[in-house]
From Swiss-Prot:
Keywords: ATP-binding, Chaperone, GTP-binding, Hydrolase, Nucleotide-binding. It is an enzyme of class 3 (hydrolase). The keyword Magnesium does not apply. This is Putative GTPase PYRAB02490. PANTHER family: LAO_AO TRANSPORT SYSTEM ATPASE, LYSINE/ARGININE/ORNITHINE TRANSPORT SYSTEM KINASE.
């Protein structure tokens, strides 16, 4: 079945591509098989992460950015991360409905992914979905997240360019941003820039960035602050140009290759950690380490030594959690 879906995907079959994303999102074993088979086809798409607090108008902004990319004949993929209500189990799509106008365009593939409360695995599922869209043939893939928490940080770390969207009047929004995404944002956007307080937000953001001037000098890229009014299409072309400018900078400086290599390193570490944690969990559930747990309870051994013994049992030695 998977081989057939992949063959159909290679021919541009959208339904087969959607099915593959569903499988990588929900079936761990099939996800492994799919990624193994499509991996040689990946590495061509440019990934743009779009994040920021709820109500910043990210979906409207993204709707306009899709248009800019399509004007250039680019095939566009969109992965929109939806927070799922714990009460209804439904995704809160809100103004993402606007993006659906592109759904009849064969050059645009839009996919919503719900958190379903399993935040830990969401970054991995997003990463795998990106690979499917990359293999499908997307030139640019936008990943939109809601909020500015750790999960969003983990997800946008899968991007080549990170766009952080804020709006005037969010109170201590600059402080909030500094606590979360300031470190990894490549471009800042003040959307709804026709609202009162836009100038103050622009000044505050630039001031915060200027305090890090040594860092930008060393990096070679000082994140620009772009003002937009997405509903009126103002500033969209400038934002799209800045995204392309950042890509050119990354490619020219060799940082894109470096960034992607680092991402692969992190991905492998995450996968290895997940495999080991899964094996340990399964072994404990089967009662295989009752004796070790009993010895820790009786203070015969400490938890670090117990963990070391369990790891040696599971992976045959060579990996220790004890301090050097």
């Amino acid at each position: 079945m998977i081989d057939e879906l992949i063959e159909r995907m290679k021919k541009g079959d959208r339904r087969a591509t959607a099915r593959l994303i569903t499988l990588v999102e929900n079936d761990e074993e099939k996800a492994r098989e799919i990624i193994r088979k499509i991996y040689p086809l990946t590495g061509n798409a440019y990934i743009v992460g779009i994040t920021g607090p709820p109500g910043a108008g990210k979906s409207t902004l993204l709707d306009k950015l899709i248009k800019e990319a399509r004007k250039e004949g680019l095939i566009v993929g969109v992965i929109a991360i939806d927070p799922t209500s714990p009460f209804t189990g439904g995704a809160l799509l809100g103004d993402r409905i606007r993006m659906q106008r592109h759904s009849t365009d064969p050059g645009v593939f839009i996919r919503s992914m719900a958190t379903r409360g399993s935040l830990g695995g969401l970054a991995k599922a997003t990463n795998d979905a990106i690979k499917v869209l990359d293999a499908y043939g997307c030139d640019v893939i936008f990943v939109e997240t809601v909020g500015v928490g750790q999960v969003e940080v983990d997800i946008v770390k899968t991007a080549d360019t990170v766009v952080l969207v804020t709006v005037p009047g969010l109170g201590d929004d600059v402080q909030t941003i500094k606590a979360g995404l300031m470190e990894i944002a490549d471009i800042f956007v003040i959307n709804k820039a026709d609202k009162e307080g836009a100038d103050a937000t622009y000044f505050e953001l630039n001031l915060a960035l200027d305090l890090e001037s040594d860092k930008w000098r060393e990096l070679g890229w000082r994140p620009p602050v772009v003002e937009t009014v997405a509903t009126m299409n103002k500033g969209i072309k400038e934002l799209w140009d800045k995204i392309k400018e950042h890509r050119e900078f990354l490619e020219r400086s060799g940082r894109l290759k470096e960034k992607r290599r680092k991402r692969i390193e992190e991905e492998i570490k995450t996968i290895v950690s997940g495999i080991i944690a899964g094996k340990v969990e399964a072994s404990i559930k089967r009662g295989e380490f009752e004796e070790i747990i009993r010895r820790v309870s009786q203070k015969d051994i400490d938890p670090y030594s117990a963990a070391d013994m369990i790891l040696k049992e599971i992976i045959g030695g060579g990996l220790s959690v004890q301090e050097n």
